[in-house]
């Protein structure tokens, strides 16, 4: 949600900035706007606008706020959302589809909290961002928004998130509120440890616990904890891949990351994290009595992770970005498998009932 390293908060080439917007009438086009204009002149305009095109065409007074929230880079919201959907689908009663209401609540919450995390990140990092070519045009770094404006936006995002959280049971409210220390403190981790991606994993996958207790009312089962462990290791994979784009900048400004810590041994570590992810998801499936579609989906996600780790070029920023974005496919594959597995649970229960 939150991070310079999650691609989300650090991929700032596309940030449009009106430098000194309060005192100047000089405007500059950002890279995403240029690409959008270029693309739209060469191809028929899509009937469905993309997130980046919506931000690029937004009113000038609104655009810096949308950019600060990373609305033009929705991959961060998806990566926050998928563990929530896994948990909700897994906690759904046998033979039923997951609640659209719950999925919608968590979808809105994922968008709001990821946006809030990006604001928090930029408030902490604005002085770093001014020194880096790719980040110096972020709204806070370049001055198109003030700290006061960012804090006002943050207050609105957190208030809206709280309103959504209060729709859940009180156990879930307590679980959700307990994540705030991680949300606020995560951006500081990269100043003190080479493992900020681990802290990100703890923070970013809280929905794996919250989705379960939103339906079940407690965390008495081991299943959500296995899912949380799997999602944490998954984050270590995709965010380490992403962090390799920024190695030179990180060294220059003194920011730490797993990309710098693991270096040439990155693929060995990513392979180990991949094994841990699959093992944890297997344990989660056993603990929650999943049926065969879950394990088919798990095999597909294993292949997807293997492809990522096996083919990523950690010295090629473009390839790292492509592999990073591909993780949304893993999210939807696993979600689909859990939904199908839950629908079949009732059939399996009927079939085995005569033998008990």
Curated annotation (Swiss-Prot):
It holds the Pfam family UbiA. The chain crosses the membrane at residues 71-91, 93-113, 150-170, 195-215, 269-289, 332-352. Keywords: Isoprene biosynthesis, Membrane, Mitochondrion, Mitochondrion inner membrane, Transferase, Transit peptide, Transmembrane, Transmembrane helix, Ubiquinone biosynthesis. It is found in: Mitochondrion inner membrane. Its EC number is 2.5.1.39. Belongs to the UbiA prenyltransferase family. Catalyzes the prenylation of para-hydroxybenzoate (PHB) with an all-trans polyprenyl group. Mediates the second step in the final reaction sequence of coenzyme Q (CoQ) biosynthesis, which is the condensation of the polyisoprenoid side chain with PHB, generating the first membrane-bound Q intermediate. HAMAP family: UbiA (MF_01635). This is 4-hydroxybenzoate polyprenyltransferase, mitochondrial. It comes from Caenorhabditis elegans. The gene is coq-2.
């Amino acid at each position: 949600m939150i991070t310079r390293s999650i691609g989300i908060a650090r991929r700032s080439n596309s940030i449009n900035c009106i430098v000194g917007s309060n005192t100047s009438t000089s405007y500059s086009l950002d890279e995403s706007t240029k690409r959008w204009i270029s693309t739209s002149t060469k191809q028929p305009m899509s009937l469905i606008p993309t997130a980046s095109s919506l931000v690029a065409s937004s009113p000038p007074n609104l655009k810096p706020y949308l950019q600060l929230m990373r609305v033009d880079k929705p991959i961060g919201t998806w990566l926050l959302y998928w563990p929530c959907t896994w948990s909700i689908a897994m906690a759904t009663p046998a033979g039923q589809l997951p609640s659209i209401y719950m999925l919608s609540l968590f979808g809105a919450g994922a968008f709001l909290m990821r946006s809030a995390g990006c604001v928090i990140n930029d408030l902490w990092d604005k002085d770093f961002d001014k020194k880096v070519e790719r980040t110096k045009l972020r709204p806070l770094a370049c001055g198109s928004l003030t700290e006061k404006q960012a804090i006002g936006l943050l207050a609105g995002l957190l208030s809206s998130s709280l309103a959504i959280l209060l729709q859940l049971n009180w156990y879930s409210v307590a679980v959700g509120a307990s994540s705030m220390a991680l949300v606020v403190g995560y951006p500081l981790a990269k100043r003190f440890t080479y493992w900020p991606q681990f802290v990100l994993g703890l923070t970013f996958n809280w929905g794996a616990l919250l989705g379960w207790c939103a339906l079940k009312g407690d965390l008495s089962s081991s299943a959500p904890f296995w899912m949380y462990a799997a999602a944490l290791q998954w984050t270590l994979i995709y965010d380490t891949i992403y962090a390799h784009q920024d190695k030179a900048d990180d060294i220059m400004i003194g920011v730490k990351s797993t990309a710098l810590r693991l270096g040439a041994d990155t693929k060995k570590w990513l392979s180990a994290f991949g094994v841990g992810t699959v093992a944890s998801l297997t344990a989660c499936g056993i603990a929650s009595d999943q049926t065969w579609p879950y394990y088919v989906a798990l095999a597909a996600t294993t292949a997807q992770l293997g492809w990522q780790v096996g083919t990523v070029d950690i010295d090629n920023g473009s390839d790292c970005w492509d592999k990073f974005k591909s993780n949304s496919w893993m999210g939807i594959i696993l979600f689909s498998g859990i939904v199908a597995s839950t629908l079949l649970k009732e059939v399996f229960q009927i079939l085995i009932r005569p033998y008990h």
